[in-house]
Curated annotation (Swiss-Prot):
GO biological process: one example: translation
Record's keyword annotation contains Secreted: no
Co-factor: note: Binds 1 zinc ion per subunit.
One protein family per Pfam: Ribosomal_L37e
Ranges in a coiled coil: none
Gene: rpl37
Zinc finger (C4-type): 19-37
Function (record text): Binds to the 23S rRNA.
Residues at which Zn(2+) binds: C19, C22, C34, C37
GO molecular function, one term: zinc ion binding
Entry GO terms, CC: cytosolic large ribosomal subunit
Cofactors required: Zn(2+)
UniProt record similarity statement: Belongs to the eukaryotic ribosomal protein eL37 family.
Protein name (database record): Large ribosomal subunit protein eL37
């Protein structure tokens, strides 16, 4: 049995599986790290040499659930929820 490049073509097992952080099939099973987002490290993997990849993954490309409401709260001066003052009839 040879151990060189000949045996590289004979592999049938998956080296990568789905990543639980980014969802891509980039999580290396033996290394236990994601090649795409760098999971389980705390910071997301990103490099300046891949500007196009940064554009795909940056803030504003997903649902931006929280950011949608920020401009609305900014206009009202970031007021917290407060009870409305009752208007009593002046006597």
């Amino acid at each position: 049995m040879t151990k060189g490049t000949f045996s590289f073509g004979r592999r049938h097992t998956k080296s990568h599986t789905l990543c639980r952080r980014c969802g891509k099939s980039s999580f290396h099973i033996q290394k236990k790290t994601c090649a795409s987002c760098g999971y389980p490290s705390a910071k997301t993997r990103s490099y300046n040499w891949s500007i196009k990849a940064q554009r795909r993954k940056t803030t504003g490309t997903g649902r931006t659930r929280y950011l949608k409401t920020v401009h609305k709260r900014f206009n009202s001066g970031f007021k917290e929820a407060s009870l409305a003052v009752k208007k009593t009839a002046a006597k």
